[in-house]
Swiss-Prot record:
Coiled coil: none
Family: Belongs to the glycosyl hydrolase 7 (cellulase C) family.
Glycosylation sites: N136
Function, as annotated: Has endoglucanase activity on substrates containing beta-1,4 glycosidic bonds, like in carboxymethylcellulose (CMC), hydroxyethylcellulose (HEC) and beta-glucan. Involved in the degradation of complex natural cellulosic substrates.
Localization of this protein: Secreted
Annotated protein name in UniProt: Probable endo-beta-1,4-glucanase celB
Length: 407
């Protein structure tokens, strides 16, 4: 059963002079997750997901005119963020499957393509984990904890990225007088690339074209041929709206990257290899502190896999400050300690699938980062040859170290 939230469920949110919530109810797909403890075991949680605000229809109040155009905000409706909030209405999404999102119990499948009106449409869905209230994001505090999930990456060819990562978004999605919709409608996204998120930033009109910066922990960026994980610290806490040159100095957009192929383990990850991507994989991420407490300094990030009842250790060393010492930007922006501070404050799980029209995902799976050929990441090639491209995440759980998996 999906969680349905109409405007009535937000009666406590201020609506005066604010971007209105429309008449179409939001129908969040449930995604059962698990909170685990070394003594109590794992307890199921009635969580759900929401698509990013940019997937929602935002239109003029009392009319069918969109508040955005192909080039951004409609200036006649949104000359400034206050006027925009008064003129525009956000509608809920009732059928997530039409956006490439399918759920079943504790599993979620994200699809890159879908045939609509006889044409193949590229979808690239990105969803965020909501708390059990369905109104706020689920913010996980993971210092001296572990985060574990199962993933089927077998339908992700070269050039694709089925990602699961953490973003230091605000729990409410930036809910305010100008943004009553908040997390319920997928507002507030940010990451360490500080990209311009489009017409909306923290749920308000992005009239300045600002970038949305925040700390990011990439737990899993992968396809069937290559995988990485990467922390991305920032000098700021939470979402920061950057402009101009500062967007390139606030966060470490590249991060300290752990890629087994790039580190020399070329027969470690892939079809039929040690970590066999032809089969489902359990991925465990552990965030170990210097004093083994939830208030300590992040000292090490460990990765291990479980497949067919066997624990598979990481291909080389774990990620430590020494491992990341060659990344000058990472160290200058605070390194693991700064990343750990964000993990201590709490971060929101993000699930996505996407291709890379600009770089063809070479940074992930080609040019020394993986075994893929130079043209395999071309989105046109992927669409023509792999129309069923998809990723499935399931059994998402977190808790005490060594409490989320068994063999």
């Amino acid at each position: 059963m999906a969680q349905t939230l109409a405007a009535a469920s937000l009666v406590l949110v201020p609506l005066v002079t604010a971007q209105q919530i429309g008449s179409i109810a939001e129908n969040h797909p449930e995604l059962k997750t698990y909170r685990c403890g070394s003594q109590a075991g794992c307890v199921a949680q009635s969580t759900s997901v929401v698509l990013d605000i940019n997937a929602h229809w935002i239109h003029q109040m009392g009319a069918q005119t969109s508040c955005t155009t192909s080039s951004g905000l409609d200036p006649s409706l949104c000359p400034d963020k206050v006027t925009c909030s008064q003129n525009c209405v956000v509608e809920g999404i009732t059928d997530y499957s039409s956006f490439g999102v399918q759920n079943s119990g504790d599993a979620i499948t994200l699809r890159q393509y879908q045939v609509q009106n006889g044409q193949i449409k590229t979808l690239r869905p990105r969803v965020y984990l909501l708390a059990e209230d369905g109104i706020n994001y689920s913010k996980l505090q993971l210092l001296n904890q572990e985060f574990t999930f199962d993933v089927d990456a077998s339908k992700l060819p070269c050039g694709m990225n089925g990602a699961l990562y953490l973003s230091e978004m605000d729990a409410s999605g930036g809910r305010s007088a100008l943004n009553p919709a908040g997390a319920t409608y997928g507002t507030g996204y940010c990451d360490a690339q500080c990209f311009n998120p489009g017409p909306w930033i923290n749920g308000e009109a992005n009239t300045l074209g600002a970038g949305a910066c925040c700390q990011e922990m990439d737990l899993w960026e992968a396809n069937s041929r290559s995988t990485i994980f990467s922390p991305h610290p920032c000098t700021t806490a939470g979402l920061y709206a950057c402009t101009g040159a500062e967007c390139y100095s606030i966060c470490d957009g590249y991060g300290c990257t752990y890629n087994p192929y790039e580190l020399g383990a070329k027969d470690y990850y892939g079809y039929g290899l040690t970590v066999d991507t032809a089969k489902p994989i359990t991925v465990v991420m552990q965030f170990v502190t210097a004093d083994n407490t939830a208030t300590g300094t992040l000292a090490e990030i460990r990765r291990l896999y479980v497949q067919e009842g066997m624990v598979i250790g990481n291909s080389a060393v774990a990620m430590t400050e020494a491992f990341c010492s060659s990344s000058r930007t990472f160290e200058a922006l605070g390194g693991l300690q700064r990343m750990g501070e964000a993990l201590g404050r709490g971060m929101v799980p993000v699930f996505s699938i996407w291709d890379d029209p600009s770089l063809w995902m070479h940074w992930l799976d080609s040019d020394g980062a993986g075994p893929c050929g130079s043209t395999e990441g071309d989105p046109a090639f992927i669409q023509a040859n792999y129309p069923n491209t998809a990723v499935t995440f399931s059994k998402v759980r977190w808790g005490d170290i060594d409490s989320t998996y068994s063999v």
